[in-house]
Structure formats: structure tokens, C-alpha cells
Amino acid sequence: MSDPVIKRALVSVSDKTGIVDFCRELGAMGVEIFSTGGTLRILQESGIEAASISTITGFPEIMDGRVKTLHPKIHGGLLAVRDNEDHVGQAKANGIEFIDMVVVNLYPFEATVAKPDVTFEEAIENIDIGGPSMLRSAAKNNESVTVVTDSADYATVLDEMRSNNGATRRETRLTLARKVFELTSRYDRAIADYLIGAEESGETEAPAAISVKLEKELDMRYGENPHQSAGFYRLVDGQGSRCFDDFFDKLHGKELSYNNMLDIAAATGLVEEFRGEDPAVVIIKHTNPCGVAQAGTLVDAYRKAFSTDTQSPFGGIIAFNVPLDMETALAVDEIFTEILIAPAYEDGVLDMLMKKKNRRLVLQKKALLQEVMEYKSTQFGMLVQDRDSKIVSREDLKVVTKRQPDEQELDDMMFAWKIAKHVKSNTIVYVKNGQTIGVGAGQMSRIDSAKIARSKAAEAGLDIKGSAVASDAFFPFADGLLAAAEAGATSVIQPGGSIRDDEVIAAADENNLAMVFTSMRHFKH
């Protein structure tokens, strides 16, 4: 069978990107266009000749547009096998004309349910019925019908029609049909996941089933190590579609590596704890913070963060919660850093920083999603959990010692707690006046993490005396707390919950420490 010339097209899109220009070109090629609702209105207002779908069906759109394309004259025109005499005869007998092209994208269900204030009724109204039905009919009959779901394919389809006497090639129609079934399967899975979530609302159990699709965005030179192959993928699940380019723009430098991506995730995850607050700087190495500080100016915050550990930042990643200014950029330029991440770059800063070709400069365009599922792959299955996005406020703190913390201690404890959440367990973090003094990360023993944090402070020449200490989990024994007291800390923030809490509290009282419980643990593996 030769490639069928496209004579009649059915167009009905929610995302109207590029649709006017596309249909204008179709019309110029002599294609007869039929459309519905808002799409029809936009086409006609743009001077494009298009007829209502009702001229095919002989039936009006009803029930607020819920029923408009579910009709035998539509689906018969799509599904008829063109070289089947019985199909052709039945089509003629029933006044059915063939439809050669379907251009449809679906109601934005995933985007709708991703909104924090979406109602159940709003979600239900964004379940597309007619769209998937037309897409599936057209895709099934891809031998004869061209089906387009993505505006990114408009130019390709038009170019092919121009070079192929108004027809698309068989290979193209098959590729477009495959995209349809990928789209509709994901769409249905998103609806099912939402309804499962609605049914389980208020329950603490994970969903009974989750559909996850990974779409490769780029190949990477290698993975965590040179002998490992790797790629970066767009994640599509019941909570929507998300990828690096949705949140960031790489403005300068080499391609991002596997490890770069991990570090960017760690850096932005922590710096967003300070979104909307005074200038804050986060310095990351191997996904752990080696220096974090907050100050009245960005350059002061950077200098404080850098002074926590003046060796580890070399080759590290630095993230800022406010636009990067020239004074801070010049200070940062004194050392080699892999990546800088900022919500904006002030005039002249990019030009200055781009003089070092190997430095990557990243713009964070919008906040990361917080209420999304987190996936961790193992060799024997997938672990799924809510992101650790819950925030502890001052009102949540429970003072468990005789001495109450003063305002500065409270400020430093809250600051330290934000950081401890983002450090590999076991975690001990010392903070003083809005600056990390020492960070102990990833040790099998909490007391060892405390020792490392203390030694890092000593190496940097920073005084722990009067600092606040945060522990990501409870102190199982008093030894960790006593180590902090011996180092000079005066306040402690920890989850509590140990069977030896009374012993730990007594040790705090004996050493005149102010201690608060958060009742929330922040293990990070």
C-alpha cells in the first residue's frame, strides 16, 4: 500500500503551542481541517479555514464538551482499513469519510493534580475521554493514519509531507503511533495513581502500585566511576514529569557528569532550606556540606562558609539562595570550583566567571518540587518513600533541660538542624552565629562523627565554645552529648526517642546545656 495522501485532519489540542502555524501550513497544502471547542475558535480567529466536528457527526457537542468526538463517523473514519473492500463499503453505506490525520494532545491531568490546592472534582474534569479514544483509533490504524501528539513533531511532519507529495512515510507513522501508546499508558497510570492516592488519603501506606517511566535526556561520559556507563533520564510518574531542564539552565562549562548531578541535587536541596531568607551559601563536596553560612551580605556568608573548611571547597559545588553579585563572585573566583548555582547572576558576573572554561555555571529557574516520591534502586527491587521535606519550626521544639536556650542558641539550633537533615548519617553539626563550625558526616558511630566535627573545627581554627550542636538522630548514650559539652557547645538539638533519654537529659543538665527535642529524625543513607 502506498503512503496515503493527507486530505482530512482532525485537530483538538489542550496545549496549543504551535498549532496555528501548523494548521496554516496544512491548509496551504489543501488539507481539510475539522476541530472542536477552543481549538476551533483559535484557528478561526487566526484566519484558518476550519470546520466544527459537528459537521462530520451531525450531532452537537453536549454535556459541557464531555461528548463531542465519541461518534461512529469519527472512529469509523479513523479505523477503516483502506484496502479492505468490506470496510470501504460499510463506510460508504453509512456516510463515513476517511480521516487521514489526528492532531490531539490531552487535558493536562498530571499538571492539574500536581497543584497543591487541586480538588477532586477539578481532577476528575481533567480526565480526557475523547482524546485518548481518537489517539488510540488513529494509532491502531497507523498504516493509513498519521497521528500527532507532540508539538515538537509538527515541523518533521510538515517537512515530510512537502517532500512526499502530501503524505507521511510508513516509518514515521509507526513512530508516531508508538508515542501515542506511551502517552496513553502513562496518562492512564497517572489517573489510577491519583485515584489510589485519593482513596488512601490520610493513610500512611505507600501506594499499592506505581508506574514510573524514564525517558533518556542525555548520555553521560560515564557514571560514578569511569568503568560505569550512565545516562540522565526524565522521570515521569503519577506526580508528573520532571527533569533537570525544567528547573535549571546550564549557562557555561563542560557537560554535567553523573557526580555533578548528584552534587547539584544535594546543594540545591540544602540551599532551598533558606529560600526567602537572608543571604546563604552552601558548599558541597561529594554530596555532603563542608561549609554553610548565612549573613547580612552574600560575600560575608560565603567567607563564613568557606572558613569552615578551606580545603574541601576546591573542586566543590557552591549554591546561593540569592542572586550572585560581583563582590561574591570575585571572592569565589579565587579558588577552583566545579559548579556555581544561583537563582540569578548580576550584571557582569557571568562574563567574569566565564573566563574559566571548565567551571560550570548553573541558573536555578524555580524551586524544586518538595512533595514528590523518592526512589532508590537496589539489585533486588525499588524502595519508595516520601521526600524528607517536613519542616520543624520553633513551635515544634520541646525544651527538655532545666536551662532554656536563649535567642541566639535557638537561631543556631534551627540553623544546625536544617543542615543536619542534608548530611550523611551518622551526623553531628556544630553551628555558631549562623555558620557551620564543624561537620561530622557518615560515620558508623555517632561519637566518631562528633570527634570528626570537633577536629574539623580545630583544623579551621574555629572556636566551638558557645556553639549549638545538631544530631540527625537521638544520642543512644550520653557519650556523644558529653563530647559536645567537652568541646564547648552550650545547646543541643536532636530528635529524642532513645530509651536512655533520661540519662542524656541528666548529662545535659549536669553540664548546663540547653537541649531541645524535635521528635523528628533525619537519617540519610
UniProtKB/Swiss-Prot annotation:
Keywords assigned: Hydrolase, Multifunctional enzyme, Purine biosynthesis, Transferase
Disulfide bonds: none
Substrates-to-products reaction catalysed: (6R)-10-formyltetrahydrofolate + 5-amino-1-(5-phospho-beta-D-ribosyl)imidazole-4-carboxamide = 5-formamido-1-(5-phospho-D-ribosyl)imidazole-4-carboxamide + (6S)-5,6,7,8-tetrahydrofolate; IMP + H2O = 5-formamido-1-(5-phospho-D-ribosyl)imidazole-4-carboxamide
A Pfam family: AICARFT_IMPCHas
SMART domains reported for this sequence: AICARFT_IMPCHas, MGS
One Gene Ontology cellular component annotation held by this UniProt entry: cytosol
Enzyme Commission number(s): 2.1.2.3, 3.5.4.10
Keyword Hydrolase: yes
Residue ranges annotated for the MGS-like domain, each copy included: 1-149
Gene3D superfamilies linked: 3.40.140.20, Methylglyoxal synthase-like domain
InterPro entries named among the record's database cross-references: AICAR_Tfase_dup_dom_sf (IPR024051), Cytidine_deaminase-like (IPR016193), MGS-like_dom (IPR011607), MGS-like_dom_sf (IPR036914), PurH-like (IPR002695)
Transmembrane segments: none
Keyword Hydrolase part of the UniProt annotation: yes
Pathway listed: Purine metabolism; IMP biosynthesis via de novo pathway; 5-formamido-1-(5-phospho-D-ribosyl)imidazole-4-carboxamide from 5-amino-1-(5-phospho-D-ribosyl)imidazole-4-carboxamide (10-formyl THF route): step 1/1; Purine metabolism; IMP biosynthesis via de novo pathway; IMP from 5-formamido-1-(5-phospho-D-ribosyl)imidazole-4-carboxamide: step 1/1
One Gene Ontology term of the molecular function aspect: phosphoribosylaminoimidazolecarboxamide formyltransferase activity
BP terms from Gene Ontology: 'de novo' IMP biosynthetic process
NCBIfam families cross-referenced by the UniProt entry: PRK00881.1, purH
Domains as described in the record: The IMP cyclohydrolase activity resides in the N-terminal region.
Family that this chain belongs to: Belongs to the PurH family.
Entry protein name: Bifunctional purine biosynthesis protein PurH
Gene designation per UniProt: purH
